[in-house]
Amino acid sequence: MGKTKVVGIAGRYGTRYGSTLRKKIRDILEKRYSPHTCPFCGHKGKVYRLSTGVWACKKCGAKWAGGAYMPKTESAKLFSDIIIRE
């Protein structure tokens, strides 16, 4: 059987680092590479990460600071009115 059945995308690490850590990495990477919605134009699937914490939308060209693995963090959801000012 394949060694990536349980750990999925983190199977690229092979047998290194232990199964528990690879399962945690799997959860993080699945969130990072899942299709995200742009907070400016609302288009889903065109958001990508430029660098750590910097996200951009291919459709509208907007760039914003977010989390390292998610374009919008939990704290940003709570304080969205304060963070985004027009």
UniProtKB/Swiss-Prot annotation:
- Does ATP-binding show up as a keyword for this record? no
Cofactor(s) this protein cannot do without: Zn(2+)
Q: Name one Pfam family in it.
A: Ribosomal_L37ae
Which species is this UniProt entry from? Desulfurococcus amylolyticus (strain DSM 18924 / JCM 16383 / VKM B-2413 / 1221n)
Q: Which InterPro entries match?
A: Ribosomal_eL37/eL43, Ribosomal_eL43, Ribosomal_protein_eL43, Ribosomal_zn-bd
| Entry superkingdom | Archaea
Cofactor binding description: Binds 1 zinc ion per subunit.
State any GO BP term from the record.
Answer: translation
Q: Where are the C4-type Zn fingers located?
A: 38-60
Q: Which family does it belong to?
A: Belongs to the eukaryotic ribosomal protein eL43 family.
Which terms in the GO cellular component ontology are assigned?
A: ribonucleoprotein complex; ribosome
Keyword field: Metal-binding, Ribonucleoprotein, Ribosomal protein, RNA-binding, Zinc, Zinc-finger
HAMAP family documented for this protein: Ribosomal_eL43
This protein is called what? Large ribosomal subunit protein eL43
GO-annotated molecular function: large ribosomal subunit rRNA binding; structural constituent of ribosome; zinc ion binding
